[in-house]
Amino acid sequence: MRKIRYLFACSVICALLCSCAVQSRVPSTDSQVSETQSYSENHWETIQAKLSDVISGADTFFSRDFEKILTIDDYCSTYGMDDTVKITKYAVIDLDQDDAPEIVLGITENDQSDCGFLVLRYENGGVVGYDFTYHQMIDLKKDGTFGYLYGVADTGYARLNFTDDSWEYIKICNVTETSDTVTFFCNGQEVSKEAYWEAVAEQDSKEEVEWLAY
């Protein structure tokens, strides 16, 4: 009987030791989440710092539209030619949902209201800039969506997708019009007029982006 009790006690102790050993090899989920969040935050901050160097004038960027390297002052001179062009405001925002920031700069000509925007983003180790007219990026929202207007041919709401050296719209809802037809779309699918206006109302209700004085 003593021998049986002894063997049973030994087996229990071994089981406990094995259990502890297995548990010690299981990584902490909390630790993994913390490390991922830390990496994401550092990634965002690093890119934002590079973009901020450009808007402060401490560094340059490559203009896709002018196809040359410019400072912000150079850009305003090149953009305006005979007009007085100024950057009046900016917003830090993730336009294409890639977990990295872009900076959108608001442009005025001759002290008039917004005439367009310059979008700065980090690509392949450097900062590049894309020009947008006012009608290409109307009423920018905090989630990166906005309205656009190409006359009666095509108008609606979208977000941006950046390609190798350009950009394109990912259309959320839009309406196209010809001489005899008006067609409504949501996410690329034809829908009823009522469904379209419901999507428009949802977009209009979104919080606007926070603009900071430049």
Predicted regions and their residues:
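Blade-edge motifs of beta-propeller repeat domains
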Residues: Q32-T84, G125-Q136
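Positively charged n-region of N-terminal signal peptides that target proteins for export
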Residues: M1-Y6, S11
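Extracellular C-terminal loop/segment signatures of secreted glycoproteins
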Residues: C115-L140, W167
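Beta-propeller blade termini
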Residues: K86-L95, Q136-T145
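Acidic/hydrophobic-patterned starts of short beta strands in beta-sheet-rich repeat architectures
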Residues: Q97-I107, D143-G147
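Structural motif
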Residues: Q112-L118, T155-R159
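Acidic, small-residue rich beta-repeat scaffolds with periodic aromatic anchors
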Residues: V22-F61, T145-Y214
